[in-house]
Amino acid sequence: MQTQSSTESIFPEQAGYFSVPGAHLYTVLHQVTDPVARVLLVGPFASERHLSYNPWVRWARYLAARRIEVLRYDYRGVGESTGVFEEMSFGHWSEDIQLLAGWMAGRSPRVPFILHGLEVGAILAGRTFDEGSGDALLLWSPPANANQALGSTLRQWAAGGRQLYESSENRRSASGYIRELQEGAFVQVQGYLWSGRLWRDSFHFNMPTTLNEENKVSSDSKRPVKIVKLGKDASPLVKPFRGYLEVTDFSELYSRNFEWIASVLSSPIRKFNEEND
């Protein structure tokens, strides 16, 4: 992994590019000395990236300040990663997280590895965890399927800022855009060109049914799982998004979720302990 150091905080943040088939993922490693755990942050879908960016980065720094090494990244075709977004699929993004998870979990020294996802990122993290990656899983507001997240984004975008730039005769409702996607057309949403194929596939990109009951899966697999439903007060991490200039205090959210991670690290049921005794 090629990296370039940043000095924006007291903890080293290494920005670089991670090679995947046909593209390079932009990554930032929040590196710590003598980590007690590592976390891979799987962020929300493309069109929400810029809105949730600030609290997502602050969360990574919060964890790093508590000796948890964090890797965050942009999806293939999104943000500063390379790749053509309209050519991407959930399969590509699933492949990316598998490769990143393997790299992160294999870093030295070996410590517990936690997958953490937000909205569509929660589905990606959940599916990767279900396939055997990770010693614990933390999910924020996972939808039942990706279409729930895409649909709510499209509706808010169609009802909000999108219409400010259109003449009255060119304004369309969310249902109009959905109809175009269903017919196979491309629709630009928050700067990203959604394809009809992506829209169709989103209905079938689901959370694993094995993760429906977090307590049961934690007990059965001996790998802790926590699912958190974020409220409207968690904007701009989740929809509906408020104004760009509003600053939300996430200290309580960060604290509660860190406490869960800390409890996981002291728990004897960790798969990591069983494999490394």
Predicted regions and their residues:
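N-terminal cap/lid segment of alpha/beta-hydrolase-fold proteins
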Residues: 1-37, 250
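Terminal, non-globular segments
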Residues: 15-17, 27-28, 72, 262-277
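Short, surface-exposed "cap/lid" segments of acyl-processing enzymes
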Residues: 20-22, 31-74, 80, 103
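Structural motif
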Residues: 36-39, 114, 136
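Catalytic nucleophile-loop/oxyanion-hole region of alpha/beta-hydrolase
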Residues: 78-108
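Alpha/beta-hydrolase fold nucleophile elbow
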Residues: 107-119
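Glycine-rich nucleophile elbow surrounding the catalytic serine of serine-hydrolase chemistry
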Residues: 116-129
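The alpha/beta-hydrolase serine catalytic core
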Residues: 133-272
